[in-house]
Amino acid sequence: KKPENYGGMVQLKGPSQDFFNYFLEFKRQKGEMFGQSSLGLSNIYTTKLDFAPKDNLKFSLMYQLAEEDNWLNWIQDNFFGIYKRKQKTTVASINWFGGDKHELRLKAQMVGFTARDPLPFVSNTIGDLNKVEANIDPFTLSDLAFQVRYRYEILPLAYLYVVYSRGGRIIEFDQENSLKEIYKRPWNEPQADTFTVKVRYRF
């Protein structure tokens, strides 16, 4: 008997170097190792690149694509939808250090999630799913977390911080498939857009 959750993966890692590193992974699984089960198998492709042209400067980029044909989504009460799911995630960062006094960090995490071809189901008292006649809309989720942080050492144990943050989450009931357009939505209509300056002294 197969376990409720199972899967396998193939990984390729580049040589460990200070200048350049890369990581590739393909994963096929049903459910999560320490999470909920799922109706079917999902495919997850991940690639990550690290580039450090100088000792005090590093660039990092990660991209992941997850696909699942029978993604189960709870809507309300005992009403569920089964969708074709795609999730595209991009994480980019830049870290720079100017001696002992200056530190600049930039990080952006963007998620584009699409749920298409929805089918409606209801569950009975023992958890079985039964297909019903109902209308469910496909939807698109956009998520952004962007931050730039600068730190300056004024005196020993005294620091100036300048932080800019922007982001949010937007859900639209549409079939937009352009990753560029999906990523742009929370940037153009942010739920958070803050600029902070503070001084901290450690006693």
Name each model feature, range by range.
Residues 1-203:
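Exposed, low-structure sequence patches enriched in small/polar residues
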